[in-house]
Amino acid sequence: MVANSPSDGAVDLYVLMDDGTIATTEIKNAVLAACNDDTVRPLTDKVSVKDPQKVSYNITFTYYVPKDSSLSSTEIKAAVDKAVAEFVAWQCGKLGRDINPSVLTGKLMQTGIKRVALTSPVFTTLRDGSDDTTPQVASVGTITATNGGYEDE
């Protein structure tokens, strides 16, 4: 959660769930009820619970497998899919976390592939709300992973 004060007497709360999703209305109402209680907030403050701004990104890459790999193409694909899922979960797990393709490349290279040609995402700075602006959260769009085949070392 991020709290900021865009103007005097106003407090905006931005809630992100543990899995990186935007909070449901039920959760936002519970947060508002807890933070808007007269015993918790200053009398003149107006508390609001708002959604962070989603910044959509796509993942597109081609990966290449070493010809002498001991892993089958099915095993490599499963490892690549798992690495992408881990990246997506990490990427949306915190408000203001920059979209960082280097992290994706690192995760992919640990799967046993030889190399990856990453087309998207590109590095994108996201706002964390610390400057009293609406915080942003990354939201994955399409994922296109292409096996480019085998290559010699």
Outline where the language-model segments fall.
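An aromatic-glycine-centered, glycine-rich loop/turn in mixed alpha/beta architecture
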Residues: 77-153
